[in-house]
Amino acid sequence: VGHYHAEPGVISYSGIPEFEFNLRLAREVKTHLETNGLQVRMIGERGNLIFLNHRTRAAQGADLFLSIHHDSAREYLLPRREEFAGFSLFISRHNPHAAKSLACASAIGAALRAAGMTPSRYHADPVIGENRPFADELNGVHFYDNLGIGKAAKMPSVLVEAGVIINREEEARMNDPAVRARIADAIARGAKQCLK
């Protein structure tokens, strides 16, 4: 579960902390992964696990580290918030299993697209604080080499930004239980496919 109570991430259009979105989606992903026969270890569910090294240590022995988040945009871009929507997936080339991370991220992105979701493109834009090159443009996967969790994990690692919650319409979609279930199912199907 991305973020924690003391640092809850971005605040959505309607004022809900990102951590709440992350927790709901992570629980749904867990259910779908278990339904697909995979074992899941939830990390950060109580909102008190602060340090990245504690999170990756808690994941020791896992085949894949998924970090569930919801997206925003740089502060100077907030007046254009309604332009930003879609999912993004991030991997680090500094992860010791970068090729497997990319394979898993691509599988998750393909499953999200098959479920009707659209990848966000703005992280690849040449603007301050972004400029994250595509690793797999079709499936919304970006390289983010200095991503803390991506570098720290000792197993393949994918950070999922499920949607842009500063966008009013996208926040409403992320709050829709049917949409959340579709996203969670797609993440689980992609993860299962890459772990075969």
Predicted feature locations:
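Short glycine-rich His-centered loop
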Residues: 1-15
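Active-site-proximal helix/loop segments of hydrolytic enzymes
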Residues: 13-196
